[in-house]
A protein has these predicted regions:
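Conserved class I S-adenosyl-L-methionine
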Residues: 1-38, 40-48, 51-55, 138-165
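Class I SAM-dependent methyltransferase SAM/SAH-binding core
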Residues: 49-99
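Short alpha-helix
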Residues: 180-196
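A short acidic, Gly/Pro-enriched loop at the edge of an enzyme's catalytic core
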Residues: 98-108
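A short glycine-rich, Lys/Arg-flanked "PGG" loop and its adjoining helix->strand segment in the class I
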Residues: 121-133
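A short SAM/SAH-binding and catalytic strip from SAM-dependent methyltransferases
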Residues: 107-120
């Protein structure tokens, strides 16, 4: 792994404890909405600590779940999360999205991972290869309109007593202060996913006070 990629994975390892345990209501609503689109075998690209696993596995049409993440500590925590909900099978793979081999997905998701991908077009094309024809892919990522300070200030009212809240807040502030992340306007993101071969069923910015783009995408029935 290149040094830059190693440093990013290390940063996510440091974030893993607070990320998994702190769930502001805005994040809860996001997980619930994304999970509602899932069916069959689900693949989560950039699964982090697996916070969405219980929301996905409770969907009646979902049969199984696989998560992929490059940060080893996130992977460990996601595996633990899957073990807490054993009614349906889950599998967590350690690696970069563009390099792993997993079973093709009936539906797929990626939440707040896109902005950290070193080559977004390459990763989107890989996701397309791992999605069955006609499959749904829900892509959710913070946008150029995000006001992280305001979002965290609102979340503090409900999370301030959580023992990992301060750690969660500081890491999220650092994310948005980074010059290496990729934040697009919604129309820019739509053009990129279309160029990668996806059609757009839905697109909105209703969550995170307008600072998150959520796209419901579909792979053509005619693509392999």
């Amino acid at each position: 792994m290149h040094t830059a990629m190693h440093n990013m994975a290390t940063d996510w390892d440091d974030y893993s404890r607070s990320f998994q345990s702190v769930m502001p209501s805005q994040m809860l609503r996001l997980n619930q909405e994304v999970a509602s689109h899932m069916r069959g075998h689900v693949v989560d690209f950039g699964c982090g600590g697996g916070k969405i696993i219980p929301f996905v596995l409770e969907q009646p049409l979902v049969t199984s779940y696989a998560g992929i993440d490059a940060a080893l500590e996130m992977v460990r925590r996601a595996r633990w999360m899957g073990e807490q909900f054993p009614e349906k099978p889950s599998r967590i793979v350690h690696g970069r999205i563009e390099e792993v081999v997993v079973e093709k997905a009936d539906s797929a998701l990626s939440i707040n991972s896109y902005y950290n991908w070193p080559d977004t077009r390459l990763v989107l094309e890989k996701i397309g290869q791992l999605l069955k024809p006609g499959g749904i892919f829900v892509l959710a990522t913070i946008s150029a309109r995000l006001d992280m300070k305001a979002l965290l200030q609102a979340a503090q009212k409900e999370c301030v007593a959580h023992p990992h809240w301060a750690e969660f807040r500081e890491h999220n502030l650092r994310i948005c202060e980074s010059t290496s992340i990729r934040l697009l306007e919604l129309d820019e993101l739509i053009r990129e996913v279309q160029a990668a071969g996806f059609s757009v069923d839905e697109a909105h910015q209703h969550l995170y006070e307008g600072g998150l783009s959520l796209l419901v995408l579909r792979k053509s029935q005619h693509r392999g």
